[in-house]
């Protein structure tokens, strides 16, 4: 009886072990950590230009003036670790200085922000090993649409949420709304990763694979935020070594860790489809054998 149970358990865990081996093999072949380092470098280079472009878009629409403040606080509170307040203060100073630039400098900011999107596109298609390239004009249109519509849609969602919370009938649902708002960062991360894994690759990605990979990445991202904040709070070695400049290495490490999570979710999405194809091929070979 015990031997039968052990055999069944071993038989059930064998596919999972094979899938994990395939996942590790792809991570090693794709040099995932190196890709994450490249994206972290480009992200840090593009951070201020990207934020400057986003805030400039909000400034162009007076209806989003109040929402932009809420969105700013939401981003720094939920997508950066414990030092979000310090980083926010520095970035806002940099953005304020960028407002004094000429038209040529503004174009440079936009190009730098688009460079980040191109790097993300290149890294994800490397993981999917896609050889098909989009037309340059189409790629530019997609990047520009994400750069312009993304912040506006986020601002619109926050405006709608604020409006619903202000309604009288919503006062009886405060508990439910509070619970929903607590998981809102997780849902937003999940949807963002799902769109990233579904749209960016130039080959077709099965929707269920993208959903699973995005969900794992969202969970790791939320857990990583809490773990990183706990580490910074409990083991303040960076503050002891770097003093006032501690925010710089903390931001570097957090951005690198974030891209590791994003690319790991992409690897999981790819491996799910590849493992399914390999399994179907193996079953087909068994059926063809006399």
Curated annotation (Swiss-Prot):
Sequence intervals crossing the membrane: 39-61, 101-120, 141-163, 183-205, 212-234, 244-266
GO cellular component, one term: plasma membrane
Pfam families xref list: Virul_fac_BrkB
UniProt keyword Transmembrane helix present: yes
Superkingdom as given in the UniProt entry: Bacteria
Record's bilayer topology term: Multi-pass membrane protein
Protein name per the record: UPF0761 membrane protein YihY
UniProt source species: Escherichia coli (strain K12)
Lineage of source species: Bacteria, Pseudomonadati, Pseudomonadota, Gammaproteobacteria, Enterobacterales
């Amino acid at each position: 009886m015990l031997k039968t149970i052990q055999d069944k358990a071993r038989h059930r865990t064998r596919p999972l072990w094979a899938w994990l081996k395939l996942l590790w093999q792809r991570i090693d072949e794709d040099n995932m950590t190196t890709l994450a380092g490249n994206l972290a470098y480009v992200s840090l280079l593009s951070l201020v230009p990207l934020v400057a472009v986003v805030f400039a878009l909000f400034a162009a629409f007076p209806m989003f003036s109040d929402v932009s403040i809420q969105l700013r606080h939401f981003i720094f509170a939920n997508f950066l670790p414990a030092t979000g307040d310090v980083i926010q203060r520095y970035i806002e100073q940099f953005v304020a200085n960028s407002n004094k630039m000429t038209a040529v400098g503004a174009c440079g900011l936009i190009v730098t922000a688009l460079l980040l999107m191109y790097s993300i596109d290149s890294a994800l298609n490397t993981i999917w090993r896609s050889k098909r390239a989009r037309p340059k004009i189409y790629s530019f249109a997609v990047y520009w649409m994400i750069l312009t519509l993304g912040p506006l849609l986020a601002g619109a969602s926050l405006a709608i949420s604020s409006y619903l919370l202000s309604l009288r009938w919503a006062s009886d649902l405060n508990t439910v709304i509070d619970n929903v708002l607590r998981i809102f960062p997780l849902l937003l991360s999940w949807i963002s990763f799902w769109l990233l894994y579904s749209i960016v690759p130039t080959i077709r990605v099965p929707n269920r694979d993208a959903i699973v990979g995005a969900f794992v990445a969202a969970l790791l991202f939320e857990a990583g935020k809490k773990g990183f904040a706990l580490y910074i709070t409990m083991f303040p070695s960076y503050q002891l070594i770097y003093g006032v400049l501690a925010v710089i290495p903390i931001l570097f490490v957090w951005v690198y860790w974030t891209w590791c999570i994003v690319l790991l979710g992409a690897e999981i999405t790819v491996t799910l489809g590849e493992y399914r194809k390999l399994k179907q091929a193996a079953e087909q070979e068994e059926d063809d054998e006399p």
